[in-house]
């Protein structure tokens, strides 16, 4: 069975660890799923649609107390996932483009967490859009892709101080905040050629640039206590890769 384990240093909700199931405190997961879809293909158009719903029971969570990691709460709950995927592609001679949209709502519910109210899954991203372009010119293949999606959920930390100025920290509602919107543009080109001296060998030379406009995306939040005696809590933004060029050479024989 899989247990969702909360991590103190991370403002998203959980890690995933594995344990053997039993008939008492670690029951076997039980789930069901419904899916419906449709597909259209004509005149170099492709349109694909799919909707789904999944319910899972007997999910386990191990939730640590924020101020004392030796204390923890063990809970069994459920998860529900529902979503829609739409894919559209068009081919025009040596150029093709495709656009996709995904809606996803994934929530957990545990009697002993979040006052028994449902809360978003750690990986829940409501809306995702991808738009890609491909073009072939002689022996060179070009591609351009744009990705956009909502920020991932995370849990806000509340700070309180007593009369002795000793700080205590607690969670607010689980995963009730979201990171900023994520988006980036990627470019690549690949050149395929053979040397005149040996036709049995094929070369592929490629150039790719990820995050072309150098978007400073926040992909997570991390918290650490400072090294001072005050034990001040520091919350840091973890950012994704900056603009990243890559060159690759492959040899086939």
Question: What do these predicted regions represent?
Answer:
Residues 1, 17, 38-40, 49-53, ...:
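Transmembrane beta-barrel strands of outer-membrane/channel proteins
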Residues 1-34, 51-74, 145-166, 216-220:
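Surface-exposed extracellular loop regions of Gram-negative outer-membrane beta-barrel proteins
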Residues 19-25, 33, 69-75, 83, ...:
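Extracellular loop and loop/strand-boundary signature of outer-membrane beta-barrel proteins
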Residues 30-34, 41-43, 53, 78-82, ...:
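Residues that define the transmembrane beta-barrel architecture of outer-membrane proteins
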Residues 36-40, 86-90, 99, 131-135, ...:
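Residues on the lipid-exposed face of transmembrane beta-strands in outer-membrane beta-barrel proteins
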Residues 44, 94, 139, 194-203:
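Short loop/turn motifs that connect adjacent beta-strands in outer-membrane beta-barrel proteins
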Residues 52-55, 70-158:
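Gram-negative outer-membrane beta-barrel transporters
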Residues 57, 148-165, 184, 191-253:
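C-terminal beta-signal and adjacent terminal beta-strands/loops
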